């Protein structure tokens, strides 16, 4: 599972996901990519599940790049706890994804294989996505 090695603060505000992604919205490394069409928090487990699905599908042929990293801690309060008495403890990490962001990139395989692998990874994501080709 992906998570930061060290971070300055244990807890973070939730924040807002306004607008579109101006960074990380172009294909940089591979030939094929999966692009987000909706804003969402994507957990480190979902990122890992998508990566595994793609890796299993392309086997040895292709190379895969994960373009998002979960750097936001999400806190959860224990169940049946009364209101107040501070913020909960950090449970898991999420990547804040805005529309237009590239999630995964791939190269070194045929288009039909890449399309199949990326569609399987897309089914693991909690948002609408699209398959794009560079060039």
From Swiss-Prot:
Disulfide bridges in this chain: none
Alphabetical list of InterPro entries matching this protein: Ribosomal_uL16, Ribosomal_uL16_bact-type, Ribosomal_uL16_CS, Ribosomal_uL16_dom, Ribosomal_uL16_sf
Claim: Flavoprotein is one of the keywords in the record: no
Primary localisation category: plastid
Subcellular location: Plastid, Chloroplast
Pfam annotation, one family: Ribosomal_L16
GO cellular component: chloroplast; mitochondrial large ribosomal subunit
GO BP annotations listed: mitochondrial translation
Matches recorded under SUPFAM superfamilies: Ribosomal protein L16p/L10e
GO terms, molecular function: rRNA binding; structural constituent of ribosome
Matches recorded under Gene3D superfamilies: Ribosomal protein L10e/L16
UniProt keyword annotation of Plastid present: yes
Keywords: Chloroplast, Plastid, Ribonucleoprotein, Ribosomal protein
Family per similarity comment: Belongs to the universal ribosomal protein uL16 family.
Quaternary assembly: Part of the 50S ribosomal subunit.
Protein name, per record: Large ribosomal subunit protein uL16c
């Amino acid at each position: 599972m992906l998570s930061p090695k060290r971070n300055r603060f244990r807890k973070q505000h939730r924040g807002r996901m306004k607008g579109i992604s101006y960074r990380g919205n172009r294909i940089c490394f591979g030939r094929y990519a999966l692009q987000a069409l909706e804003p969402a928090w994507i957990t480190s487990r979902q990122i890992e599940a998508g990566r595994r699905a793609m890796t299993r599908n392309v086997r040895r042929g292709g190379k895969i790049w994960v373009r998002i990293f979960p750097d936001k801690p999400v806190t959860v309060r224990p169940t049946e706890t009364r209101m107040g008495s501070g913020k909960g403890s950090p449970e898991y990490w999420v990547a804040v994804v805005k529309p237009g962001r590239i999630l995964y990139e791939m190269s070194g395989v045929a288009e039909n294989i890449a399309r199949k692998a990326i569609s399987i990874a897309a089914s693991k994501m909690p948002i609408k996505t699209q398959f794009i080709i560079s060039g």
